[in-house]
Amino acid sequence: MNTILAQQIASEGGVEAWMIAQQHKSLLRFLTCGSVDDGKSTLIGRLLHDTLQIYEDQLSSLHNDSKRHGTQGEKLDLALLVDGLQAEREQGITIDVAYRYFSTEKRKFIIADTPGHEQYTRNMATGASTCDLAILLIDARKGVLDQTRRHSFISTLLGIKHLVVAINKMDLVDYREETFARIREDYLTFAEQLPGDLDIRFVPLSALEGDNVAAQSANMRWYSGPTLLEVLETVDIQRAVDRQPMRFPVQYVNRPNLDFRGYAGTLASGSVKVGERIKMLPSGVESSVARIVTFDGDKEEACAGEAITLVLNDDIDISRGDLLLAANETLAPARHAAIDVVWMAEQPLAPGQSYDVKLAGKKTRARIEAICYQIDINNLTQRDVESLPLNGIGLVEMTFDEPLALDIYQQNPVTGGLIFIDRLSNVTVGAGMVRELDERGATPPVEYSAFELELNALVRRHFPHWDARDLLGDKHGAA
């Protein structure tokens, strides 16, 4: 067992008290990214090592693995703590997204170690989609590279506002201040083109030697700023979803018996209280909250990020994929949108193609109307293209088969983010972020008979797990 962990548990008065203390710590999700061999895995290994998060058996195994697979001579190869795939160890690179957890006295952390190779950019986008902060590693010998620009742009595109530029391998440039200053200036010049209001910080460090990672470096007395760990422990993460209006995508209709009907899911943004008036989209039918049910019992109020089940005072027709929001909020379902796309498939994305798209719990079909442009990551300029290739990033116009309740991604990632699914292979082939909504008129609805409408309502009410589509779409009334 980790000796430090055992001491922490003892100081808290036992396992239960320690677990309660952990629950009350704030959580920071961050990723490490950069060009190939900039030291991402080594940095994470150093953080785990210097915060005493490594168990004795792991340390013993690391000594053995460093002799067989290590790239640091007689020193411990801390990257092997993270590079778990056999292919990664043999090639000395990171391929998959590796997640690690650690904590300090001030905060809990979830780290996503993302690949640096361009052909694995899709993996990097996956890792960035749930993070609040990005650590961008730059090799002090090489400076700002194309992949650094690519990862910076993807991070900001996916809504990350806090960037920590870690200028690594300072030991290989004799810890020179002028090298740090030059790279800092180069990156700030590039960052002027990045979208959004960003919080950018710079830390000179050596992940291999431990300089300015968890402790101040004696080799860089000219640097008076915080260490990387101090930045991670103190950065103020203001989540946009906390300030956004209530959004509750229904993931599951919970009906264990005839006396209970609840709507389960994770509150995407805002808050909800018992007694609050809400409405359901796409129908627009209103009701009020009777109960907020959780694993730990009923609550009077729930906040963004909580997994809850809502029980309403009225028996209305709601199924998986519907969206609940405050009754006084206006959100018009849209069939047309401009989407920022990160393409992840070998077959290019082209106009005329159709894909299944999944947004929260909603799944429907969409058609690609046009490729507006592709972003040139080297200079962030827009290029006219006929299709979007693997790892390409661009703006796409799309039409959905049915109206969807969408938000702008930068305002609400849950109700503004979607994935593309190949209809034949069921493989995820792309990620999309809603940029703009187009309120063009929808196609005239099909006229259904009274019998068809009644049958559809009965199926949706009594067999919600069938995920039957509402034939009346956004004009549907109460059941």
Swiss-Prot record:
Pathway: Sulfur metabolism; hydrogen sulfide biosynthesis; sulfite from sulfate: step 1/3. Residues 34-41 are annotated as: G1. The keyword ATP-binding applies. Its EC number is 2.7.7.4. Residues 92-96 are annotated as: G2. Transmembrane segments: none annotated. Keywords: ATP-binding, GTP-binding, Nucleotide-binding, Nucleotidyltransferase, Transferase. It catalyses: sulfate + ATP + H(+) = adenosine 5'-phosphosulfate + diphosphate. PROSITE patterns: G_TR_1, G_TR_2. One of its GO terms (biological process) is sulfate assimilation. It is an enzyme of class 2 (transferase). One of its GO terms (molecular function) is GTPase activity. InterPro entries: CysN_GTP-bd, CysN_II, CysN_NoDQ_III, G_TR_CS, GTP-eEF1A_C, P-loop_NTPase, Small_GTP-bd, SO4_adenylTrfase_lsu. Residues 25-239 form the tr-type G domain. Residues 206-208 are annotated as: G5. Residues 113-116 are annotated as: G3. GTP binds at residues 34-41, 113-117, 168-171. With CysD forms the ATP sulfurylase (ATPS) that catalyzes the adenylation of sulfate producing adenosine 5'-phosphosulfate (APS) and diphosphate, the first enzymatic step in sulfur assimilation pathway. APS synthesis involves the formation of a high-energy phosphoric-sulfuric acid anhydride bond driven by GTP hydrolysis by CysN coupled to ATP hydrolysis by CysD. Heterodimer composed of CysD, the smaller subunit, and CysN. This is Sulfate adenylyltransferase subunit 1. The gene is cysN.
